[in-house]
Amino acid sequence: MSQKPKLKLYMKSKSLYLTLFALVFQCVTFNVLYSQNENTLRIAFWNMENFFDPFVDSTRTYNDYTEDGSQHWTLSRFYKKRNNIYKTILALSEGAPLSVLGMCEVENTFVTTMLFQETPLKRHNYRVIHYEGDDRRGIDVAIAYSIDKLQLISSEVIKIRNPDNKRFKTRDILYAKFYDRQSDTLHCFVNHWPSRYGGEKETIHLRELAAYILKDKVDSLIRASDCIPKIVIMGDFNDTPLDNSMLNVLKAKPPERRHVEDTLVNLFVNADDLGFEGTLKHQYRWQIFDQIIISNSLYNDSKSLRYINKSATIFHPDFLFVDDETYGGKKLFRTYIGPKYQGGYSDHLPVYIDLRSTF
């Protein structure tokens, strides 16, 4: 049997399960006091860790995540991963639609369609922005947004080119411009900067390059505006908030260290204020690589769209963890550890902030 008929049969067999889950979820959340309301825009980001479809892509040499590949990535494993992700998004959004969800490590429009159109997330009216990028493995950044909350004005990708290495390829920065229901403009950037694979010091120049390119785009928005635009920058930066790329190149300052002339405020510096100690764990150490940064114009009191104080959060429900028998405490419930299939969620925790739109 070919892969496409198998897919159709699998989808039919899952439809009853998804319907029942949606009904149960609605019953469970009916009496929950949501922190979101109609004036709130929840902006979230999540590195979904290798969210691949199981089909061979003849245009790429990297096909580890296929049935015959090294990870033995089958259709049933794909659906398990997809279901884990949508349940997490429902919990993260507290039953209401997220206004913006930045994503990274998604392969293509097939996986985003199966996530947002073939699960209970469909009722939240998400639309997805995705461009095929240059990453060798085929993992991209993407944005899902609620058409009930925001209107898309434009989007584009920002390439990260290394003038010293013409063969260098990495993930794009995704930029989108929105209007909210009050016609307030919101600029969003989604990032997945070069990894530390090969050594932190050996690769730091690549993340600093990404920071320079992003800062140049932010500065161009400011030059084109009469006042500082309302900007949200999110992503897996593969650096901490206090690393040089973030603090001195991008110039994203902690709230307590910002000055009037500073444009960007990093809301994910102090773990004590975020509800959890980090977004990923390496051995015994938690770090904050996944961050959301906003413009000063959102941080200061505003008569329109503004940041809700202390809403920055690392989302850490128990179901995203397992016991860490090697280093103690908890670790993230991943899809794989090396080649060994675990059936979990991701190696990163989601993060979010809330904005308030004043009517």
Give the location of each predicted region.
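N-terminal, active-site-proximal structural segment of metallo-dependent hydrolase catalytic domains
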Residues: 33-119, 123, 129-139, 212, ...
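Second-shell loop/turn segments in exported
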Residues: 69-76, 97-103, 130-131, 162-164, ...
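Metal-dependent phosphoester/phosphodiester hydrolase catalytic core
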Residues: 57-59, 181-212, 216
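Metal-dependent phosphoester-hydrolase catalytic domains
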Residues: 219-231, 239-359
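Structured beta-strand-rich core segments of catalytic domains in phosphoester-bond hydrolases
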Residues: 48, 106-187, 191-194
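Bacterial Sec-dependent N-terminal signal peptides
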Residues: 1-38
